[in-house]
UniProtKB/Swiss-Prot annotation:
This is Small ribosomal subunit protein eS12. Part of the small subunit (SSU) processome, first precursor of the small eukaryotic ribosomal subunit. During the assembly of the SSU processome in the nucleolus, many ribosome biogenesis factors, an RNA chaperone and ribosomal proteins associate with the nascent pre-rRNA and work in concert to generate RNA folding, modifications, rearrangements and cleavage as well as targeted degradation of pre-ribosomal RNA by the RNA exosome. Subunit of the 40S ribosomal complex. GO terms for cellular component: cytosolic large ribosomal subunit; cytosolic ribosome; cytosolic small ribosomal subunit; nucleolus; small-subunit processome; synapse. The modification N-acetylalanine is found at A2. It comes from Rattus norvegicus (Rat).
Length: 132
């Protein structure tokens, strides 16, 4: 029992916590994937968190998203690869071995609903508190 608590309650880094939060939000239908859905969610102030890919090849996307985030004081996390982000938010097929294939790149994701309280959500919120 104690070992299980350490495994589950060990120190979680921000990337792992982000993956967990995105997965939970996806299950509870709380994600806006892609620039159009993300911009609509940000404009309606439904967003809790925004994730943007650093390798987004359209500078106007980045400008639009960052402007909306600044206007509504919404937190931003940048990830290095849009393919990785696409995989995290379910924009891929999973083969028999459980490996993702046909991954579609996703440059912007907005979390509208965390789904449920979790340690990962707390890690993300703590990360933003420390950042300010």
């Amino acid at each position: 029992m104690a070992e299980e608590g350490i495994a589950a309650g060990g120190v979680m880094d921000v990337n792992t916590a982000l993956q967990e939060v995105l997965k939970t939000a996806l299950i509870h239908d709380g994600l806006a994937r892609g620039i159009r859905e993300a911009a609509k969610a940000l404009d309606k102030r439904q967003a809790h968190l925004c994730v943007l890919a650093s390798n987004c090849d359209e500078p106007m996307y980045v400008k639009l998203v960052e402007a909306l985030l600044a206007e509504h004081q919404i937190n931003l996390i940048k990830v290095d690869d849009n393919k990785k982000l696409g995989e995290w938010v379910g924009l891929c097929k999973i083969d028999r071995e459980g490996k993702p294939r046909k991954v579609v790149g996703c440059s912007c994701v907005v979390v509208k609903d965390y789904g449920k309280e979790s340690q990962a959500k707390d890690v993300i919120e703590e990360y933003f508190k420390c950042k300010k």
